[in-house]
Amino acid sequence: GYTPTMAPIQPKLGYSHYDGENWFTEENDLDNSFPGFVDVTLDPNNENKAFISSFGSTNQINTYQTGGLFVVENNEITNFYNNLNSPLEDIYETNPLINSVTVRISGSVFDNQGNLWIANIGLSNELKKFSNGSWTEFDISAGKPENSFGLSEIVIDSNNTVWIGTRDDGIIAFNENGNRITGLI
């Protein structure tokens, strides 16, 4: 979870899911504890695969606590994307005075071509697309007021326009075809 100012809460509770008959729970591991989970996106082509968005903050750079995107398939974490292995970014990466890694993924959604769109808050390229193992980044700052911070829910319509809620500044609409960005307040 996160606070009203988009700071990670990090309750470290793990995650659970119900398969129609049984509950499965992955509890927190003290050696590599979980950050605050904020959103779950199911793969439309694989009901046993989920992408879990998280907010993290830690001074231990090679742990789940950094925050990022978890890929869970058949009840196992099969991948974890953060600033070390993907374009997902640490919001403090450019500040050498802060001895912490803070990756904040507020949500994700699949489009009708199977691409996963990801909101990575607090950066210039806050919108990412993950397609067939490749990443693309988009600068959506033109759709936000200056000094705006924080993205929330992310959805896609039938025209493949990505709609992203903001913390206090309305909605951003982005369409990759023509690289169109609009801020609606």
Label each region the model flagged.
Residues 1-185:
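Carboxylate-rich, polar loop motifs that coordinate divalent cations or form catalytic acidic clusters
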